[in-house]
A protein has these predicted regions:
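Extended catalytic cores of very large enzyme megasubunits
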Residues: 1-783
Length: 785
């Protein structure tokens, strides 16, 4: 490359695709992953093709970091990373930032009950910062940290877990604002028997209540302060305006302020300002914007929080038993002395469960991680338990390991004409991307020695998919239907089976992951259980599970999908027994928030659509209204003709024009005094607005024109609460009719031609539009798990 090409920005998607595919191909070729140079070239071409056609996308750190050194020679100063040399197996320190990139999005890090030493609390914040800077996320289980008031070995009492979590939250928030690639992402998890579990459950709930208090309180302070000043200014007698006995409005304003809990020092300050001649007091007011000052003031806003729930705890809830909490030191001492630990506190399990429910209902945290079930499906349980997860909870494995993700866009493997899912193409893509993720482990660097070593030892991958909500809609199948559950199960089964089979194939050449021998029996047990799920085996056939999964129901699954799923898991078990596996884990289903946009997905991960119409904020300003691209395809699949489909889509998203609109249209606007040029300008910007009232405003029409031609008073043109449509004489009924016609109802309910029996196909996670009533009930989703 020329100097300009080497150090200029990437201006074409092809440059990025070649940077990524070229890096994977280079490392794979150099380390024996391809049988011939022709195979390597074919691999490069296929990977570029899949990226360009939005069939698959790797996780964000791959886009940020992979290939910057290989393609452009970019190095950068070392950032304290480590890697295992793939040729020697030796742990080495990275000499620059990009020769070994950081392609992993997901990390799980351990933290010990130590303040300043390596592996301890303050060291964790440094390791987290190293990850955030390069666009990755991390999670940790903080259950080893002593609780509030727990005795310290050197005397005194521990300040407790929450004090340290607040420090980590602040650190993440700072990087959040100044990071080089994306916002910080972290997961904080805690075992249910920790002494501080109650405070942890209520943490985010309490902090969000503080935000509400700041928002409401600041507005009240502003209002009451200025009501006091107004009472002072309105009193006619200058000498007695501060005398509450003679200025009764002032006395009332002060009394009302005190009843509203306005602090006395604020009231005193207002009176002093009044004495100095001030007529208005500016008090900083806050809003509920998540990027606003109120949220930045409180803690707990820079992480997802989860509690680790065991079967024992759930049984205690069902039995209405007490639940014991333990000092961390007591657990350690009891283990050393081979005795049962003594609890520091006992709480009714139902009280904790109610706390979790209330907090999650209020602020969506904490989430639940089912510790027993997770560990029963753990491929490497002899090497230790799974304690936590990455920020989005799709990756669960041993502490101090990492996972790099990629997701396949399922819609790209579905043929709308034949209404068949291409399992052969899907399987081929899974194989190629399993190789890409394995190569990414080979070339990667990591934020600590422990993570570098353990990622080399276990080589965990995270291949998944996205857009299943759109796929099901295109198939004409409701998301909460039994058929949807079976199809989702079969596609997930094929994903896991083909990926683990590819891992076994790589193991036959490259050897299994270094810790495989120690975990062989357990990993093969897990693989056999996956195979049983593909065959929908009876519960008693599963090995080592207390809660068995729902298998693929052959009554609802297309035979060709079921057969493909069963065939690949037969191969996994057979090949795994022969060769072992190159990777301790191969698949996850990630939320795909960012890469879902890259692949132009209508739905993310395994989720249904949350709304048929979305409003996308554009980087250059403005907003774009987008309908789920699968709606017209689904209507065709359900038998509606093109005219009917167009009318249904217009009902949902609107016509986007004044022409033909009831109530408010080109003709009526011209009669009200607007010119053709102004109407044309307004119509060109309809896609950036959500209602006629927000579109037809003095700022959009022109303030001078409003004053001179439409007779709007000057004091109104800058008033955000002024309604120009009302001023022009339009009624609420006319405005509502125009909104429905131009901007759409945002729901398919009530659309012309649509059959009631077809509505379920278009159901979303939320009610759609102001008139929508239907949504996917949360219990139906749970039933189909």
């Amino acid at each position: 490359l020329s100097e300009e090409e080497k150090f200029g920005e990437e201006i074409d998607g092809k440059q990025t695709f070649r940077r990524l595919a070229g890096t994977w191909t280079y490392w794979g070729w150099k380390h024996g992953y391809f049988a011939s140079e022709e195979d390597a070239k074919a691999y490069f071409d296929e990977m570029c093709y899949m990226l360009a056609f939005q069939m698959v996308s790797p996780n964000s750190p791959q886009w940020f970091n992979t290939g910057l050194n290989w393609a452009y020679g970019i190095e950068g100063p070392a950032q304290g990373h480590y890697f295992v040399n793939p040729k020697t197996g030796d742990l080495e320190r990275s000499v620059n930032a990009y020769e070994h990139p950081q392609p992993h999005a997901c990390f799980i890090q351990s933290v010990s009950d130590d303040l300043v030493n390596e592996g301890g609390i303050m060291d964790l914040w440094t390791r987290e910062a190293r990850l955030f800077k390069f666009g990755s996320g991390t999670g940790s289980n903080f259950s080893k940290i002593r609780g509030d008031g727990e005795p310290l070995s050197g005397g005194g009492m521990s300040s407790g877990l929450m004090s340290f979590l607040r420090i980590g939250d602040r650190a993440a928030g700072a990087i959040n604002s100044g990071g080089t690639t994306r916002r910080a992402a972290k997961m904080v998890s805690l075992d249910m028997d920790h002494p501080d579990i109650e405070a942890f459950i209520d943490w985010k709930l309490t902090e969000e209540e503080k935000v509400a208090a700041l928002v409401s309180g600041s507005q009240h302070l502003q209002n009451h302060a200025n009501e006091i000043l107004a009472a002072i200014q309105a009193h006619p007698d200058e000498d007695s305006k501060f005398d509450q006995g003679k200025n009764r409005p002032l006395a009332k304003a002060i009394s009302v302020a005190m009843q509203a809990y306005v602090p006395e020092n604020i009231i005193a300050r207002v009176l002093e300002l009044g004495e100095q001649g001030y007529t208005h007091m500016d008090i900083e007011t806050y809003d509920t914007s998540w990027e606003g000052e109120a949220y930045s003031t409180v803690s707990g806003q820079n992480s997802n929080n989860s509690v680790r729930v065991s079967n024992d705890f759930m049984q205690a809830v069902l039995n209405e038993d007490d639940w014991n909490l333990y000092w961390r030191t007591e657990l350690d001492n009891a283990k050393e002395e081979s005795r049962e630990p003594s609890p520091c506190k006992s709480i009714p399990a139902n009280d904790l469960w109610d706390k979790i429910a209330k907090a999650a209902w209020s602020c969506a945290d904490p989430g639940l991680q089912y510790d027993t079930t997770v560990n029963e499906w753990h491929t490497c349980s002899p090497d230790g338990p799974i304690n936590g997860s990455n920020p989005c909870s799709e990756y669960m494995f041993l502490d101090d390991t990492a996972c790099n993700l990629a997701s396949l866009n399922l819609v790209k493997f579905y043929n709308d004409e034949t209404t068949k899912f291409d399992t052969e193409k899907y399987s081929h893509a899974i194989r190629l991307w399993t190789v890409a993720l394995e190569i990414s482990v080979l070339m990667a660097q990591f934020p600590s020695e422990a993570i570098a070593q353990r990622s080399y030892d276990y080589r965990t991958l995270g291949l998944g998919y996205a857009n299943i909500g759109s796929l099901l809609m295109r198939m004409g199948i409701p998301y909460d239907d039994n058929r949807a559950s079976a199809i989702c199960g079969s596609l997930s089964s094929i994903l896991g089976g083909v990926s683990y089979a590819a891992s076994a194939e790589m193991s036959s050449v490259q050897g299994p992951f270094p810790r495989y021998k120690h975990n062989k029996d357990n990993m093969l047990r897990v693989m056999r259980n996956h195979r049983r799920a593909a065959y929908n085996a009876p519960s008693e056939e599963y090995e080592g599970l207390t809660v068995t999964p729902r298998g693929i129901d052959s009554n609802y699954c297309p035979e060709y999908l079921l057969s493909a799923a069963q065939k690949c898991w037969d191969q996994v078990v057979t090949e795994g027994e022969k060769h072992g596996f190159r990777n301790a884990q191969a698949t996850v289903i990630a939320p795909t928030g960012t890469i879902g946009i890259v692949m132009d997905c209508d739905t993310t991960g395994i989720e249904p659509d949350f709304a048929l119409v979305k409003f996308k904020t554009l980087a250059g300003g403005g907003m774009l209204r987008i309908i789920n691209q699968s709606v017209p395809v689904a209507l065709d699949r359900l038998g509606y003709d093109s005219v009917q489909s167009e009318e249904i889509v217009d009902y949902v998203i609107g016509t986007g024009t004044f022409s033909g609109a009831p109530g408010i249209n080109r003709e009526s606007l011209k009669r009200k005094g607007l010119t053709d040029d102004i109407i044309d300008s307004l119509e060109s910007q309809i896609s950036s607005f959500t209602s006629v009232g927000l579109l037809v405003t003095p700022s959009m029409v022109g303030t001078d024109f409003c004053v001179e031609k439409l007779r709007v008073k000057e004091e109104f043109v800058d008033n955000w609460n002024f309604d120009l449509l009302e001023h022009l004489g339009y009624t609420n009924e006319q405005i509502n009719e125009a909104n429905d016609y131009i901007f759409g109802r945002l729901t398919i309910e009530g659309a012309p031609h649509i059959k009631d029996s077809d509505l379920a196909v278009f159901d979303c996670a939320n009610k759609c539009g102001k008139d929508g009533e239907r949504f996917i009930h949360y219990m139906l989703s749970l039933i189909h798990i």
